[in-house]
């Protein structure tokens, strides 16, 4: 099983609960495999949005408050910048102020890879690690990708940023994850590397 297939499998498993919803732009069309088959199996649990990131994430908060478990798919992390009012001033703050559960999973793809360009390859993960109220899950192996996603969709009752590195999508064996020391264009910030191992039979 590849990294991408692991995410998709966990997503399918989570959607077996009728209160779990998938939100995002073009999510019904598969997004290169990330949401493949989701609309075919769970058409009533898929909400497709126009290009309006702040609307997507603020409505996800409303759905969570209404008892749903929304999963917001962002094909590129770069455009989370357009939703920062929701992502900084409301979603992480509400559970702390109101002592309420807010089970929102924000999936953000870091688009490093050939042909991605400067506006489709940034990694804002450090921002969210500095914000109170967010749990950040950044899987490195197919096993972690599956287990973290399934946990977020079935157990967690808090806002989670789930970071999916596009360069991992086809991987089933040892891979290297570049860890930027500061936010910047992929390849433009100083970084160190660590090797993470996965079971090739997974």
Regions of interest found by a model, annotated:
Residues 1-183, 193:
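Thiamine diphosphate
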Residues 188-190:
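Acidic, proline/serine/threonine- and glycine-rich low-complexity intrinsically disordered segments
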Residues 193-202:
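Short, acidic loop-beta-alpha module within alpha/beta folds
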């Amino acid at each position: 099983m590849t990294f991408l297939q692991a995410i998709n499998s966990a997503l399918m498993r989570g959607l077996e609960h009728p209160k779990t919803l998938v939100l995002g732009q073009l999510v019904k069309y598969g997004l290169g495999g990330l949401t493949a088959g989701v609309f075919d199996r769970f058409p009533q649990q898929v909400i497709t949005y126009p290009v309006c990131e702040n609307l997507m994430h603020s409505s996800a908060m409303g759905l969570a408050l209404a008892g749903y478990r929304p999963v917001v798919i962002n094909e590129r992390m770069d455009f989370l910048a357009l939703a920062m009012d929701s992502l900084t001033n409301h979603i992480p703050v509400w559970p702390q102020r109101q002592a309420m559960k807010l089970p929102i999973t924000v999936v953000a793809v870091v688009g490093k890879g050939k042909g991605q360009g400067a506006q489709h390859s940034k990694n804002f993960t450090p921002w969210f690690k500095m914000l109170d109220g967010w749990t950040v899950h950044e899987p490195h192996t197919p096993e972690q990708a599956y287990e973290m996603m399934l946990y977020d969709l079935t157990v967690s009752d808090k806002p989670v940023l789930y970071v999916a590195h596009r360069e991992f999508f086809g991987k089933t064996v040892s891979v290297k994850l570049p860890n930027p020391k500061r936010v910047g264009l992929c390849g433009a910030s100083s970084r160190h590397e660590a090797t993470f191992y996965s079971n090739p039979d997974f």
